[in-house]
Amino acid sequence: MSGSSAGSSFVHLHNHTEYSMLDGAAKITPMLAEVERLGMPAVGMTDHGNMFGASEFYNSATKAGIKPIIGVEAYIAPGSRFDTRRILWGDPSQKADDVSGSGSYTHLTMMAENATGLRNLFKLSSHASFEGQLSKWSRMDAELIAEHAEGIIITTGCPSGEVQTRLRLGQDREALEAAAKWREIVGPDNYFLELMDHGLTIERRVRDGLLEIGRALNIPPLATNDCHYVTRDAAHNHEALLCVQTGKTLSDPNRFKFDGDGYYLKSAAEMRQIWDDEVPGACDSTLLIAERVQSYADVWTPRDRMPVFPVPDGHDQASWLRHEVDAGLRRRFPAGPPDGYRERAAYEIDVICSKGFPSYFLIVADLISYARSAGIRVGPGRGSAAGSLVAYALGITDIDPIPHGLLFERFLNPERTSMPDIDIDFDDRRRGEMVRYAADKWGHDRVAQVITFGTIKTKAALKDSARIHYGQPGFAIADRITKALPPAIMAKDIPLSGITDPSHERYKEAAEVRGLIETDPDVRTIYQTARGLEGLIRNAGVHACAVIMSSEPLTEAIPLWKRPQDGAIITGWDYPACEAIGLLKMDFLGLRNLTIIGDAIDNVRANRGIDLDLESVPLDDKATYELLGRGDTLGVFQLDGGPMRDLLRRMQPTGFEDVVAVIALYRPGPMGMNAHNDYADRKNNRQAIKPIHPELEEPLREILAETYGLIVYQEQIMRIAQKVASYSLARADILRKAMGKKKREVLEKEFEGFSDGMQANGFSPAAIKALWDTILPFADYAFNKSHAAGYGMVSYWTAYLKANYPAEYMAGLLTSVGDDKDKAAVYLADCRKLGITVLPPDVNESGLNFASVGQDIRYGLGAVRNVGANVVGSLLQTRNDKGKFTDFSDYLNKIDISACNKKVTESLIKAGAFDSLGHARKGLFLVHSDAVDSVLGTKKAEALGQFDLFGSNDDGTGTADPVFTIKVPDDEWEDKHKLALEREMLGLYVSGHPLNGVAHLLAAQVDTAIPAILDGDVPNDAQVRVGGILASVNRRVNKNGMPWASAQLEDLTGGIEVMFFPHTYSSYGADIVDDAVVLVNAKVAVRDDRIALIANDLTVPDFSNAEVERPLAVSLPTRQCTFDKVSALKQVLARHPGTSQVHLRLISGDRITTLALDQSLRVTPSPALMGDLKELLGPGCLGS
């Protein structure tokens, strides 16, 4: 660049985008727009210590016609990057001028001159993270940079650079040596003297020294502005962002902030006014660098980077794929595959090989084969891959696509240009093992998990803004604002700009919050600052499932990041950016339901001695379809919600295809067109099946028969196009995609071809129009049948387990919800409904997790508060080695020191885990502290190996006479207190419930069950009357000084949060106390994913004069009192819930023993119940 243009232009090279997280406030798109407005030909990006934004910056700048100059403001270790000590160069009095981060790093500005230099920056930033991490800083050193210096331009950097730091410390010789070192590393043409002027003393103090070094070493000057935001008026947004980073408020005089408002993209005239006279050539150097920087296009050129699967000698990947598919078909069909299977497989292989994907299929098959060999449960298939017979033969999927009508072309076809996408579900507890296996197999430098970026979203921006302006009181204002926002749609709030933009589609919905902004100055201030924060990147995270794999070291293609907290290697770019350059992305998904299935199968093996193979269970199991028809699907994969259970009851599924259909239909699109109810009604002959057009009745009969004349699946659209318009299935897939995109010009072109094809087959214009008009809206929501079938199989398996092995399945389900006490309460209530008793934890019987014991479930010790998995493991090992505990003294004598602490012991006592030893809980509580103290000394001696000096049994079992005994008092807490402590430790009432004895009376006075509200059966704003016991009462004061309270209201079936706002609290506050049994009239409040109640009033019922109902007596000879018979009886009783107590009369000759059954088995004595009991136990079972 020369002439007048050079003398008037400028290029900003030192810029921090939002990828300098919580420090840079410059979004890339606005930054490029400002560069274009300023008429600058190029712009640089130098984020702090990372290259996360390189891909977005390159693509956006290139699209805008602006040359991108990609760099990084690197952190340089003051010594070796491997040395994690903090090193200071000056004396203690110079601390403020010394190495940044209290001795952690200096800065160095680095830019890529070409593609080679950019790849070297990828390597440098990656190794800085791998090897130089100190606190939050990824640090390089001179040795590392020297190894990867080719194609890199560096500068002395900002005032925190090494040279400037030495100058501030008065170490002029060391400053000169540092400059000479860096100049030698990159060469004299690639080292520049970086000069900044933001009016800061720290800059002026070293300027003369810098210029002197520049003259001595012939280093050209380079003018930069340390840009952290785009325009001067965005300085306030940047101040706010720094407060978000540091947790400070704007009013804090000691907060970290930038001095002045000059850290923006200044015009060329502004920059030249600063520098042209003082340091001639400093601005021109920016243009020189911009001119020298060559295209980076090669870095972003897509190329095949898929790992090449190793195959035996004599094979290539294609021939080995054929071999493996053939072997797989023989394995799947020992008597030989059915007609047409080999032809279908051969066709699929031809397509796979023609697209260059045989290695991909072999890689996926290898991953799944390893998982199965390691006992890691794998899903039967998800997404369109379930339509591939090759995938089925290789064991990638477990669904035969042909009998289910699944299409390979929906997954892969000759017309498709993109990579196939096979997502894999694994047991979620063991997903990490699969990532490690992939890294071990293909190279730890070639496999990485994938980065994600968390942005400051609408509500978070408002809350952050409120806090930094007003501190803690600001949260109340933010709460008012967020509650006034329109409801989120698909978990997305209206953007803040849309609130005041009349052109935004949701503008009218935002009238309430707009009113607050217009009338309340505090709200307006918060809103304006929040707009500047919204959308900025807050942090980097890891994608839940994506994994990137490459045939070459990943740092040859992208930057990497080592996550400090666990050492995981993560890509520096998100997965679309990685895929765009040809890297292989796979999704390793952790599916909780596979974990539940695995636990349930383990429970069945332990409890019944049966090894279940779910892949072999029949798909026509009667008990499973009866369970589905009853809607008893709480905890069943995909079929759990209240409306879904209602749909199942309407549908009455009778085959696996119904399970697939219900998963496809239960979504907003089909439900909006009432397709889910139409399917149920047509299946059960409540609605006639009408053809789309008389001419189409016969041609489409076979395609639409399984869905009763409705178009439910995308595959049906493809088959229809094939049948009536003579499309190939590959072309039909293109039609399907076009219909889903709804672009008018594309649809018109597709209709033309579709119409021509139908006309050629003799269909009338009326039939063509009728079909097109039917397909078009259905195409928008028709579901991928392959995916529905894959997930339908998991749904069927979980339903099968619940129907046939209820205790084992529910134990797995309870284990899976962990600390989610709300979910656990719902599932415990379902256990009661199923006739399953949930037993308290027990030091002699419990394992770590919930476990099935006969027809009941035993609480796991790991579910007890303050009792960790390591402690439980130690306790179980002791029990296994030394036998069960006979009493509390024996327990303390036997357990390892790691389990012998007061907190653990107290928690186990309160949870009832020692009940089976015959001690009262209160008695144990009174003595446990002194008891633990008494044995700790001995156990510490044992741990040091000293106790053996005094002898143990000759056999080495260590069961000498107890060294400690204690007398436990018989004192016991009253039931109410005992249950309260139990709930404190377990989150739930287990051994009993405060409502036992009155729950039936309470139920008679309410109109809505709590689970119905939580399941979404009750609409927002509905008025309900509920009852239960109050827990976790939390009294608060609002910003106006008015008291209010929140509490958990629990009955025997679940719990829900209730808000008692000031107008209600003022009348009923005295009755809002823990453990109070109450009736509440309330309004349902649904906000985002949260459901709560807003109380209108409260009543404390009086049950003192309640009429006692006569128990229902059921007689059973003791010879019939078998496990199966009692289990069946409990299930019958659970199907007829009510308020009547049940007495079981056990008859043995002339002796009759009467047992009062659990409160959870109260019934309604209806004719239906009497009939069920007589059918199960015989006609004489109801005699008195």
From Swiss-Prot:
Its EC number is 2.7.7.7. It is found in: Cytoplasm. InterPro entries: DNA_pol3_alpha_NTPase_dom, DNA_pol3_alpha_thumb_dom, DNA_pol3_finger, DnaE2/DnaE/PolC, DNAPol_HHH, NA-bd_OB_tRNA, PHP_dom, Pol/His_phosphatase_N. The keyword Transferase applies. One of its GO terms (biological process) is DNA replication. GO terms for cellular component: cytoplasm; peptidoglycan-based cell wall; plasma membrane. Its main location: cytoplasm. It is an enzyme of class 2 (transferase). It catalyses: DNA(n) + a 2'-deoxyribonucleoside 5'-triphosphate = DNA(n+1) + diphosphate. One of its GO terms (molecular function) is 3'-5' exonuclease activity. Gene3D superfamilies: 1.10.150.870, Bacterial DNA polymerase III alpha subunit, thumb domain, Metal-dependent hydrolases. Keywords: Cytoplasm, DNA replication, DNA-directed DNA polymerase, Nucleotidyltransferase, Transferase. The Pol III holoenzyme complex contains at least 10 different subunits organized into 3 functionally essential subassemblies: the Pol III core, the beta sliding clamp processivity factor and the clamp-loading complex. The Pol III core (subunits alpha, epsilon and theta) contains the polymerase and the 3'-5' exonuclease proofreading activities. The polymerase is tethered to the template via the dimeric beta sliding clamp processivity factor. Belongs to the DNA polymerase type-C family. DnaE subfamily. DNA polymerase III is a complex, multichain enzyme responsible for most of the replicative synthesis in bacteria. Pol III also exhibits 3' to 5' exonuclease activity. The alpha chain is the DNA polymerase. This is DNA polymerase III subunit alpha. It comes from Mycobacterium tuberculosis (strain ATCC 25618 / H37Rv). The gene is dnaE1.
